[in-house]
Amino acid sequence: MANSDRAEGLRVSQAEIAKMIAAAEIIRDCRRDLAARNSNLVDEVTRCATICAWLHYPDGEVFDATSHAQYFFHAHAPDSRPPTERGHFHTFLRAEGMPGGVVPLLLPELAVANVATPPPQAAPLKRGERDEVSHLIAIAIDVHGEPIRLFTTNRWVTGETWYRAEDVTRMLDRFVIAEAEPSAVVNRWIGAMIQLFRPQVAALLLARDETVMAWRRRRRTHVFEDPRLEITSSLDIQLDTQLALVDGARDRPDEGAFRRVPALPPMGEGWEEGHAG
């Protein structure tokens, strides 16, 4: 994504706006539910357990057998994560739930990892008959249980099957978790977050592909397995700001409001030069 594109902003269609408005209502419902029970997203998904680094929560992860959407929450060791972050959700769509026509990007280097000691991997459990799985977006949560950042990762991080950004964007609408466990409110919230921030997620996926290809050209490494490249794009977010933008679009539907959302700033942790976090 060129610098000029980032400066101008991200175009948002009327169809996307409608989905974002609906998602905003779900987010508000989830907030009210959690507040009424004096709970938060992390406590819900971990059932108030002490968080152990690298363990996936809940036990067995969350998988919807109808949509084939999947997610888990985990945290890195305290010395390897930002001090404001408590952990993050990784979201996926498995092969059986993908739209028609999506094709994995297969390169010979995918099977090569010339690393003496590979870093920890956060691969999802296999569910369903097929192996292919796409990582959609990760959502970082702060110590208060609020979302603070969206980010994408290199292939080795989750062991995913690599699909082009445009194909992964087509998968976003198919992330639906209708299950009640471990928490119906968390399941609804994650799906709504993907829709509420859909323009930003799509832009992050495009940035992910640019980061990976730029790294590959400059460093001539097996990029998908290179542990030096972990975070491929990231964006700090403020939920209340996004909700206010959506409210503006809803209150002024005839004025072309919210045709654009704020542009992505220069990415950290992997953006362009691929500095892993």
What are these regions (language model features)?
Residues 11, 89, 140, 147, ...:
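Compositionally biased, intrinsically disordered low-complexity regions
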Residues 60-148:
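Aromatic- and glycine-enriched beta-alpha-beta binding-site module
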Residues 184-277:
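Long, compositionally biased interface segments
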Residues 5, 124-126, 141, 270-273:
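Compositionally biased, low-complexity repeat tracts
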Residues 1-65:
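N-terminal domain-onset segments
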Residues 57, 74, 273-276:
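Short amphipathic alpha-helical "recognition" segments used for binding
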Residues 110-227:
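Conserved binding-pocket/active-site segment within a compact domain
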